Amino acid sequence: MAASALRGLPVAGGGESSESEDDGWEIGYLDRTSQKLKRLLPIEEKKEKFKKAMTIGDVSLVQELLDSGISVDSNFQYGWTPLMYAASVANAELVRVLLDRGANASFEKDKQSILITACSAHGSEEQILKCVELLLSRNADPNVACRRLMTPIMYAARDGHTQVVALLVAHGAEVNTQDENGYTALTWAARQGHKNIVLKLLELGANKMLQTKDGKMPSEIAKRNKHHEIFNLLSFTLNPLEGKLQQLTKEDTICKILTTDSDREKDHIFSSYTAFGDLEVFLHGLGLEHMTDLLKERDITLRHLLTMREDEFTKNGITSKDQQKILAALKELQVEEIQFGELSEETKLEISGDEFLNFLLKLNKQCGHLITAVQNVITELPVNSQKITLEWASPQNFTSVCEELVNNVEDLSEKVCKLKDLIQKLQNERENDPTHIQLREEVSTWNSRILKRTAITICGFGFLLFICKLTFQRK
């Protein structure tokens, strides 16, 4: 058959393996003609065509075969139904068609529900979210657990699907349920390093004090897996977000967390999630989330907040208690600014050697802090754009700032080299100057050494004379 008659892409089905291929999801290409199914086919042939249509995601052929009498809940390999397979590959269109034809959204096979299959599917979060919302709209239970006692929200938290987590909670998912190892959804998010999911779960009432069966809290799990930011977030805050949305009704929670997709005519009502920005993350980490609206109203960015003076805090309505928390965080960051402009001209000209040395040491220390900070950002920055969950501006803005940083670093390097050459020149001139007058400190040090040696010598002679005198008296 000509290659042009071939359609579709091969897609792997299911999450298990078997030596038997007689009743499996066949991987391959489906030969489709433009004609409808006009003649009756043997039931086995229809099933084979149905499997192939499901495999390549051919929605039209699936509908035709269902019209011809194929059961929407047919059992295939491993006892899976077509709906479970469609959910496993996050094919939202197939899920919609099968549900509209009466497929059972609450079907389970070996304690594996279709909702769990959708939450653990390999696909984009957008498609997974659509599948999950379709299943929940058909009364799929969000709290049914698998054999390992893991619920759908645990799978979503483990795989980093923030929007799916929010949607499940909005439909009644329990956030503090524990699996066979004592892991909660929060523990899974901390283990995998999903910071935004950690923040959202705390807001939705997750208990960060629940321990695993080996006695580990989520913060300790995060630390063990080297997610230090999440460790700090869970360890050093009083969990001000806990239970913030627990008292809301289901409808209010959905409105609070989710926003509806504008394309209602084509798609089912799907949801989007508003991610945290850097300011919100900083404030939540300090337990100051109540300041978010205040700072946004005054157009105060995180960078502005970190450089505020005490009078600016008061002017912007920030209480002294909140000021102390922010200043303590800044002290931990060890970011200190050298105020050269505050030095008088006379001080600049007559600065002592000790003061100049302290200045150089402080400057070097700050450079070290900057290097460490940049290295930490490089380590934590996701290499895959799909993993970025915070609100980011255009990447072009970041690259332009980085270019300015590179230029400033090069300029700083040039200035430091000039300073080094100047100091070396002064040192050489001083060593070669025959009229150089010794510093008072050096003279005083030399004089003190002479006095000490003289005093010791006199005491020694005196002690020797005293012994000789005693000896003569005895004789």
From Swiss-Prot:
It comes from the Eukaryota. CDD domains: SAM_ASZ1. Keywords: ANK repeat, Cytoplasm, Developmental protein, Differentiation, Meiosis, Phosphoprotein, Repeat, RNA-mediated gene silencing, Spermatogenesis. Residues 1-25 are annotated as: Disordered. It is found in: Cytoplasm. One of its GO terms (biological process) is spermatogenesis. It holds the Pfam family Ank_2. The keyword Nucleus does not apply. Disulfide bonds: none annotated. GO terms for cellular component: cytoplasm; pi-body. The modification Phosphoserine is found at S17, S18, S20. Its main location: cytoplasm. Plays a central role during spermatogenesis by repressing transposable elements and preventing their mobilization, which is essential for the germline integrity. Acts via the piRNA metabolic process, which mediates the repression of transposable elements during meiosis by forming complexes composed of piRNAs and Piwi proteins and governs the methylation and subsequent repression of transposons. Its association with pi-bodies suggests a participation in the primary piRNAs metabolic process. PANTHER family: ANKYRIN REPEAT, SAM AND BASIC LEUCINE ZIPPER DOMAIN-CONTAINING PROTEIN 1. This is Ankyrin repeat, SAM and basic leucine zipper domain-containing protein 1. It comes from Homo sapiens.
